[in-house]
């Protein structure tokens, strides 16, 4: 059986990246909450590139 998690950087950033969050009202609310909480990484696209 194929595992459910098949990682892809492109798909991940398109779905959960900063620009994807900024597109919707709900996404902007998520960013606002994470800023208020003091998160160093707001979205997955803020993670350091491994290469």
From Swiss-Prot:
List the GO cellular component terms. ribonucleoprotein complex; ribosome
Q: Which GO terms describe its biological process?
A: translation
UniProt key word Ribonucleoprotein: yes
InterPro entries xref list: Ribosomal_bL34, Ribosomal_bL34_CS
The domain of life for this entry's organism is Bacteria
UniProt keywords, alphabetically: Ribonucleoprotein, Ribosomal protein
State the similarity comment: Belongs to the bacterial ribosomal protein bL34 family.
UniProt name for this protein: Large ribosomal subunit protein bL34
List the source organism. Answer: Borrelia turicatae (strain 91E135)
Source taxonomy: Bacteria, Pseudomonadati, Spirochaetota, Spirochaetia, Spirochaetales
Query: What gene name is listed for this protein?
Result: rpmH
